[in-house]
From Swiss-Prot:
Bias (Basic residues) ranges: 490-500, 522-534
Organism of derivation: Rattus norvegicus (Rat)
Glycyl lysine isopeptide (Lys-Gly) (interchain with G-Cter in SUMO) crosslink location in chain: K467, K502
A Pfam cross-reference name: Nop
Name of the gene: Nop58
Name of the featured protein: Nucleolar protein 58
Chief location of this protein within or outside the cell: nucleus
Nop domain mapped to chain residues: 282-400
GO molecular function: ATPase binding; snoRNA binding; TFIID-class transcription factor complex binding
Database matches in InterPro entries: Nop56/Nop58 (IPR045056), NOP58/56_N (IPR012974), Nop_C (IPR042239), Nop_dom (IPR002687), Nop_dom_sf (IPR036070), NOSIC (IPR012976)
Location(s) in or outside the cell: Nucleus, Nucleolus; Nucleus, Nucleoplasm
Length: 534
């Protein structure tokens, strides 16, 4: 039986001399107590040495992934196939690949593991020609290379540098503010007008460092820092200043403070450039989405880029506003809509009405960019630029929607225009060019009004006729009551009908055409009454 043993120096193939002793697994370690005993159990048949660490790294990465290296394939074809013996391997997965590709029988068992442990303990005595110092150096180099490969370590992707840089930048800003405030107050006793004329802090300190006492402003040239107009104003103010006189020692201490301010300002500029470059190297997509400072503060708040990538979009949105969040939860009020992400340019340029909506969308896209930067192999910022363009388009739509609501053009723009085919021939309407008086719409309305007046007059005439007839009938009915002592039921009904007709108002729109005409029976009765009277 042959044994494949991998070392940091090369591949070793051993021949098992006494296979009977392999049956006793528990006592096999006793056979490898000394190099002499080990040489009685196994014997080196072939040793394939690596040329350098790169070759060793390629071989071991292939072994870890369960693949056969070209160099190993050559050794197995040359040595093992000719021997026609089974091959003992430490990895069962590797044995399956060797059996599949080279058609060699492989063995993997607890006995093989114990045999490998014994060979490893006496490796220096079993492999001649390899010095212990060389073996140790190769082991150390291969260990570093393997760990770097497995962790996919990159010197550029060290987010610890970002955490420290942004913290130092914040500290420098605080120190600069304190120093500049102290410098302005201190020198303000001597020349108070200078602080009102020069608003820039760095320019103020540079002018102060160059001139010192206000008496020297008349002869000093400040064209390096100030424009001609401001320089003339400073010189004029120095002549009529209301400040007190100070000693040379005071001026000296103020100048030392100005030197500190200038040096810290220059270092801050250098540190900001370093932070920009480091952010573009580690998280280019996050930098495009929210900027260098906001991205660095998010990473610093989470601790690292990997920790930040594990957060949800809703967490990233309110990251940095934990105090306000827990205060709102405790008092049962509305929770904050944004934290550190509020300082991003996309949220800053939005109107207050849409800040919450944009911060939510920006947090969702920023989380995608963070995960792409943390786990992706590509180092380009194309994905971040594409997502930022989408957010800007969405922001424009939201802003336009608000403008349309104010102007009232939203419904007009929402209506689809009528489709007109290009082949349609459009004719010119000449009616607009005519200067002759035409019938206006007002005249048509007047004609309609006249017709309405005519119909109303006819309706009134019909009403008057109906009323006259009803009155005549009422008089006739009264006369009949006088003549006849007992009126019949039919006459009462007729009277009721006549009263009902008198009470009902007739509509003006539909004039009543059916008039109450007396029946022929009534006419006969009237004639009889007249004859009786005669």
């Amino acid at each position: 039986m042959l044994v494949l043993f991998e070392t940091s120096v090369g591949y070793a193939i051993f021949k098992v001399l006494n296979e009977k002793k392999l049956q006793e697994v528990d006592s096999l370690w006793k056979e490898f107590e000394t190099p002499e005993k080990a040489n009685k159990i196994v014997k080196l048949k072939h040793f394939e040495k690596f040329q350098d660490t790169a070759e060793a790294l390629a071989a071991f990465t292939a072994l870890m992934e369960g693949k056969i290296n070209k160099q190993l394939k050559k050794v197995l074809k040359k040595i093992v196939k000719e021997a026609h013996e089974p091959l003992a391997v430490a990895d069962a997965k590797l044995g399956g690949v060797i059996k599949e590709k080279l058609n060699l029988s492989c063995i993997h068992s607890p006995v093989v593991n114990e045999l490998m442990r014994g060979i490893r303990s006496q490796m220096d005595g079993l492999i001649p020609g390899v010095e212990p110092r060389e073996m140790a150096a190769m082991c150390l180099g291969l260990a570093h290379s393997l760990s770097r490969y497995r962790l996919k370590f990159s010197a550029d992707k060290v987010d610890t540098m970002i955490v420290q840089a942004i913290s130092l930048l914040d500290d420098l800003d605080k120190e600069l503010n304190n120093y500049i405030m102290r410098c302005r107050e201190w020198y303000g006793w001597h020349f108070p007008e200078l602080g009102k004329i020069i608003s820039d802090n760095l320019t103020y300190c540079k002018c102060l460092q160059k001139v010192g006492d206000r008496k020297n402003y008349a002869s000093a040239t400040l064209s390096e820092f100030l424009s001609e107009e401001v320089e003339a104003e400073v010189k004029a103010a120095a002549e009529i200043s209301m400040g007190t006189e100070v000693s040379e020692e005071d001026i000296c201490n103020i100048l030392h403070l100005c030197t500190q301010v200038i040096e810290i300002s220059e270092y801050r500029t250098q540190l900001y450039e370093y932070l920009q470059n480091r952010m573009m190297a580690i998280a280019p997509n996050v930098t495009v989405m929210v900027g260098e400072l906001v991205g660095a503060r998010l990473i610093a708040h989470a601790g690292s880029l990997l920790n930040l990538a594990k957060h949800a979009a809703s967490t990233v949105q309110i990251l940095g506003a934990e105090k306000a969040l827990f205060r709102a939860l405790k008092s049962r009020r509305d929770t904050p809509k944004y934290g550190l992400i509020y300082h991003a340019s996309l949220v800053g340029q939005t109107s207050p009405k849409h800040k919450g909506k944009i911060s939510r969308m920006l947090a969702a896209k920023t989380v995608l960019a963070i995960r792409y930067d943390a786990f992706g192999e590509d180092s380009s910022s194309a994905m971040g630029a594409e997502n930022r363009a989408k957010l800007e388009a969405r922001l424009r739509i939201l802003e336009d929607r608000g403008i349309r609501k104010i102007s009232g053009t939203g419904k007009a723009l929402a209506k689809a225009e009528k489709y007109e085919h290009k082949s349609e021939v459009k004719t010119y309407d000449p009616s607009g060019d005519s200067t002759l008086p035409t019938c206006s719409k007002k005249r048509k309305i007047e004609e309609v009004d006249k017709e309405d007046e005519i119909t109303e007059k006819k309706a009134k005439k019909a009403k008057i006729k109906i009323k006259a007839e009803v009155e005549e009938e009422m008089e006739e009915a009264e006369e009949e009551q006088v003549v006849e002592e007992e009126p019949t039921v039919k006459k009462k009904k007729k009277k009721d009908k006549k009263k009902h007709i008198k009470e009902e108002p007739l509509s003006e729109e539909e004039p009543c055409t059916s008039t109450a005409v007396p029946s022929p029976e009534k006419k006969k009765k009237k004639k009889k009454k007249k004859d009786a009277e005669d």
